[in-house]
Amino acid sequence: MSDRATTTASLTFESLYGTHHGWLKSWLTRKLQSAFDADDIAQDTFLRVMVSETLSTIRDPRSFLCTIAKRVMVDLFRRNALEKAYLEMLALMPEGGAPSPEERESQLETLQLLDSMLDGLNGKTREAFLLSQLDGLTYSEIAHKLGVSISSVKKYVAKAVEHCLLFRLEYGL
């Protein structure tokens, strides 16, 4: 049986990993031009597959793995961009006002959690929520800034709050 001909009837995690790990790592190395990042993303990809219950539904293992790996890459890029922005902000702080390494790590984890929590919200919903919660703007100010009605802002913020609550319930936060 060829790599691509792995059927769902015979597909186990072990066979998926054994057959496709090398290929996925090579594909990721070409995409990322970094064997180190490729190895991390390949491992995270297979970890996500292992904890999911989707093995029986996989029709094309390589396409499936590429889809998961692309999501992991997006998460990595977002996390790196968030960390870079945070470190740049810290560099602008006066020397005595910078948080300790432990506080920095905790703050960065909180930012990453918030980013994950807001993932999946559309642009205006996410923006309305952030303007309300982080910038402290009123619904009227947000409506003006976004060019929408106050009623729309209320719906956006309510949707974002619901999304965050469901996220917290799902992940036990």
UniProtKB/Swiss-Prot annotation:
Statement: the UniProt record of this protein carries the keyword DNA-binding: yes
Domain of life: Bacteria
Stimuli inducing this protein: Induced 2.1-fold by hydroxyurea.
Motif Polymerase core binding positions after renumbering to this chain: 40-52
Cysteines joined through disulfide linkages: none
DNA-binding region range list: 139-158
Gene Ontology annotations of biological process type: DNA-templated transcription initiation; intracellular iron ion homeostasis; iron ion transport; regulation of DNA-templated transcription; regulation of DNA-templated transcription initiation
Family of the protein in this entry: Belongs to the sigma-70 factor family. ECF subfamily.
Role of this protein: Sigma factors are initiation factors that promote the attachment of RNA polymerase to specific initiation sites and are then released. This sigma factor regulates transcriptional activation of the fecABCDE operon which mediates ferric citrate transport.
Protein name: Ferric citrate uptake sigma factor FecI
Taxonomic source organism: Escherichia coli (strain K12)
